[in-house]
C-alpha cells in the first residue's frame, strides 16, 4: 500500500506498547516509504513521530503544516487552545497572592533559543531577580518549544532594560497581571481533573 491509515491506534494502550507501535510505524515509514495518516488526540504521539500535522474542528481542517511550525506558532484558535492545554501554565492559584512585587512575564522560546541561559544572563547583567514560577520544554523531534513564567523584580532603568532584553530574545513575550495568572492556573487545574 502507499498509505497506511491509523485511527486512534495508540489511544487505549499502555506506554510500553504505545512506544513499540510508534517505533514499528516509524520503521515502516522509513524502510518502505509508506505514508502514514495517523488520527489521534494525543499530542505526545504527534510530537514524537509526525512530520506534518492537520488540526481539525467539526470535521474541517483548520490548520496544517510542519508539526513543529504548527505547534510553535499556532494561528487558529483551536490550535492555540490545544497547544495552551498541552504546554499550559501550572502555577498553583493559591500561590499567586503570596508572590512578591514584580513583573510577571510569560516567555515562549522555540528552537535552539529554548536551550540558551537567557534568564541567568539577564539577572546577572542587570542586577534583577528572576524567579521561575513555571517552566516547560517539549521536544518535537529534535526541536524544542519552551514556555517560562517568571517574576522579574528590580527597580528603575535596570528593570526596564532587563524586561526589554527578555522581550527581544524570545519568540513570544507577554506580561501577565496576577488575575490572568490565577485564571490560567485554575484552567490548568480544571483540565487535569
Model segments located where?
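ABC ATPase "signature
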Residues: 64-65, 73
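C-terminal boundary and immediately downstream tail of ABC-type ATPase nucleotide-binding domains
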Residues: 72-102, 106, 126
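Helical segment within the ABC ATPase nucleotide-binding domain
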Residues: 19-32
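A short, surface-exposed alpha-helical micro-motif characterized by mixed small hydrophobic
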Residues: 46-48
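Catalytic Walker B motif of ABC-type/P-loop ATPase nucleotide-binding domains
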Residues: 4-7
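H-loop/switch region of ABC-family ATPase nucleotide-binding domains
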Residues: 40-41
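Helix N-cap at the start of a conserved alpha-helix in ABC-type nucleotide-binding domains
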Residues: 15-17
